[in-house]
């Protein structure tokens, strides 16, 4: 969502003006098309709030789910990747993969981690990614006294990212800036229990307590959701995770996009397409 990223241009100076420009530009641009494809109802609702009037189709982005299949990774490979990420033998892994930036809300997760670690000392928090917040997160972990149990390992090649998902037990996110959140799907396809602060982008994607653990915004709520994720409930969700990710395959995505294009072509042939002024 462009309005969530204007800070990187304005650095806080005139940011409201930049956000309004992003909204107006989005409206102008989308209304020039016969149909608009968005990944979630959250994005559709946002565009409607901007004033977009063009027909909108909700088609979640697809991915090659086969590359994330848990059985692709041997115990030997997992052990080597865990060692690479600084995970001691016998530890369970709380995992986050993504850009280390303020909109991802990683500071919230780190705030609750000391208490999670006090209750579950066998949990290691592994953060994979790069971004402007990396040093801040390292300093926060040190200040909270959990630096030895937090591994911030930097970015990894996209071609190998499935290998890093494979070491996780629970995938955590507190972001509200996602339009779809592909990392949630990648984590589920990798057989992890997804624990996320609830967000409209997850509507229709996961069912709380069945295919993921969805938390409220408060720190205490996130802590309790993480505890639940490492309980037998989380173990059950992990068994269902791969099936929950199945609707997001590249094959289903391609079929839905083809149907959308056929609809747009049919409307244009019948003279039903909107006129762009």
Label each region the model flagged.
Residues 208-220, 228-233:
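Conserved acidic donor-binding segment of nucleotide-sugar-dependent glycosyltransferases
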Residues 176:
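Aromatic "clamp/platform" in nucleotide-sugar-dependent glycosyltransferases that forms part
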Residues 17-35:
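Membrane-proximal helix-turn-helix segments that form the acceptor-binding/catalytic region
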Residues 193-196:
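Short hydrophobic beta-strand element within catalytic cores of glycosyltransferases
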Residues 92-115, 125, 132-138:
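A conserved mid-protein helix/loop that constitutes part of the nucleotide-sugar donor-binding site
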Residues 155-156, 163-168:
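Short alpha-helical donor nucleotide-sugar binding micro-motif in glycosyltransferases
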């Amino acid at each position: 969502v462009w309005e969530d990223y204007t800070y990187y241009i304005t650095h806080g100076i005139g940011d409201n003006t930049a956000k309004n420009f992003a909204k107006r530009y989005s409206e102008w641009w989308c209304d020039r098309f016969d149909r608009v494809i968005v990944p979630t109802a959250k994005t559709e609702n946002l565009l409607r709030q901007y004033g977009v009037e063009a027909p909108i189709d909700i088609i979640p982005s697809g991915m090659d789910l086969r590359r994330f299949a848990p059985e692709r990774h041997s115990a030997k490979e997992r052990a080597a990747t865990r060692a690479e990420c600084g995970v001691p033998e016998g530890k369970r892994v709380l995992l986050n993969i993504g850009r280390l930036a303020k909109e991802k809300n990683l500071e919230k997760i780190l705030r609750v981690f000391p208490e999670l670690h006090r209750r579950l000392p066998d949990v290691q928090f592994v953060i994979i990614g790069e971004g402007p917040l990396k040093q801040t997160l390292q300093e926060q972990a040190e200040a909270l006294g959990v630096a030895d149990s937090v591994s911030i390992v930097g970015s990894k090649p996209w071609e190998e990212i499935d290998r890093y998902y494979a070491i996780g037990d629970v995938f955590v996110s507190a972001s509200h800036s996602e339009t779809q959140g592909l990392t949630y799907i990648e984590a589920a396809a990798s057989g992890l229990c997804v624990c996320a602060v609830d967000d409209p982008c997850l509507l229709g994607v996961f069912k709380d307590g069945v295919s993921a653990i969805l938390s409220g915004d408060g720190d205490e709520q996130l802590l309790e959701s993480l505890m639940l994720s490492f309980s037998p409930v989380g173990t059950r969700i992990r068994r269902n995770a791969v099936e929950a990710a199945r609707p997001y395959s590249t094959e289903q995505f391609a079929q839905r996009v083809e149907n959308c294009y056929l609809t747009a072509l049919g409307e244009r042939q019948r003279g039903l397409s909107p006129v762009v002024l």
